[in-house]
Amino acid sequence: MKVSRSFSPRRMMPVLLACWSLIAMPLQAQESTPSPQPQPQAQPQPQTMIPAPPRLAATSWILMDAGSGRILAQHNPDERLPPASLTKLMTAYLVERELNQGNISLDDQVPISEKAWRTGGSKMFIEVGDRVPVSELLHGIIIVSGNDASVAMAEYLAGGVEPFADIMNQHAARLGMENTNFVNPTGLPHDNHYSSARDLALLSRHIINDYPKHYATYSEKQFTYGGIEQPNRNRLLWRDSTADGLKTGWTEAAGYCLVSSAKRQDMRLIAVVMGTASSEARVQESQKLLSYGFRYFETLKLYDKGAVLNTSRVWEGDKDELKVGVEENVFMTVPRNRNEELTAKLDIRKGLTAPISAGETVGSMEVRLGDEVVGKRDLLALEEVQEGGFFKRMIDKVSRFFSDLWSGWFG
């Protein structure tokens, strides 16, 4: 007959102490290595005094850094306004998305319906029954603001204007455009068709960053189709050699609107002005915003995608340490000559235990400029840590028990 003995902590203590003696030394290592502080490339300079942002003759405006997403100036940024042909930024974005995913190609021949041909307002001048390449229609949408081209692509991608508008709204929600609702792909007036300066800046940032190989189209100054040459309506392209996008808009209700972007050195800004009095005014007001941003701010690259920002202790895995970093390059926009005030604080989840997948969120990073929080990012596992073998897991369990006990006793 087998006799079982009851568990006794006193009997187990020598075993546990023996295990502890084997693993105590490794436990003296830190839970994680200190995080590297931001090392901006800019050299220290005397601090620049930052004036208040310019006041514009417009209903709403916003100035955003395309790299960091930081807002540098704004006025009524969330007011719901008619966007006019700024709507076509979403139309073009969805075409670019379909191209990027391989669902369509630039050479696809799009049949032109009578509905597309009859659409009023600005035109590319396509004809009923023509078959026009996607590449030509995309140019027609972006450069000459063709309503006919916009409807043709809506029909090609979604089967009609209404289902395409539904897709537009789904993507607006996905991108965080909280004050936007689209009814058509053109921007022709409708009471329930609206957007905001903030939402349009956010959309433009995605156009620039998500599909960069298509972005050069926004800087082209003219477009010819069917023997008809038309200029790009964005006159800022002629005024500022650093400007390279994006889109104009006008209706009587919307006024004269412009979403523009310019890049100087490594800094790219996006300016949105809505509700100005003339085509000249929208250019001048946009220039004021861009000049303010480039004069008084700078965008610094703090960390590279995939750079190891922290090495953290992992329990019960096939390795004892986990490399931690960020998913994308980290940019921060700060007032000029204050880069030395940047600090980063990493908060790694305590008690990381295998298995851990590459790309799994394991903590967060907070970037401060002095006492101001200027950015937050998720911290991800840069590698996979698989579950360790039986004895490795048992040793780590004992090790962790004593580590927690030691921390509880001695803080």
PLM feature segments, named:
Residues 29-211, 222-226:
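Active-site-adjacent loops and short helices of periplasmic peptidoglycan-processing enzymes
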Residues 177-181, 189-194, 198-411:
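Domain-terminus/edge residues, biased toward the C-terminal soluble/receptor-binding domains
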Residues 9, 83, 134, 387, ...:
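Structural motif marking the loop-to-transmembrane transition
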